[in-house]
Amino acid sequence: DVDHLIVAGGAGGGGRGGGGAGGMLTGTGVAVSAGTYTITVGAGGDGGESGATGTATNGANSVALSVTATGGGHGGNNATSGYDGSVGGSGGGAGWNTNTSSAGTYGAGTAGQGYAGGALDVPAGYVYGGGGGKAEAGSTDAAGYGGDGATGYGIGATTPYYAGGGGGGRSNGDS
């Protein structure tokens, strides 16, 4: 039997919203037979620049023992398209829709793998949504903060954190 911790690739941050953490799954006592197993480690997504051509990309899935952790959702941009955070293992934070001068939406997380990205906080001075993490949604601790990663999977004396979301950007104001 084996125990596993599988984390997918984290997403790129958009020109404004933070990228979501890669989805994270754990398991204990999984029965395996002697043999060779293929394990795919998902790559991280690319960050995007502000503007119409700067859309970020999602992280890639990680797969092991027939279990798939979903790549993180990219953060939203400041543009006429790509302003919404994307769905992913953990969702991407919201950006800004320059067509309508309004906030984009944040991306949802995947159940059991991570949380949603955060919303744009205009009263805080156009602080864009943080990416979701394994332990909480983006912008939970404060506007623009990435969601916390999960703890409790340490080996030895340390307690590392896994699958934390990226922080959102901030601007001087959009109109």
Regions found by a protein language model. Name each.
Residues 108-122:
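Predominantly extracellular/luminal regions of secreted and cell-surface proteins
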Residues 1-12, 151, 155-158, 162-166:
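Beta-rich globular "head" domains
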Residues 45-101:
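Acidic, low-complexity glycine/serine/threonine-rich segments
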Residues 129-130, 154:
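Polybasic, low-complexity association/targeting segments
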Residues 7-65, 142, 147, 169-175:
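Glycine-rich strand-loop-strand elements at beta-sheet edges
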Residues 53-56, 99-104, 121, 138-154:
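Surface-exposed ligand/attachment interfaces on beta-rich extracellular proteins
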Residues 44-47, 59, 85-91, 114-117, ...:
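Collagen triple-helix signature
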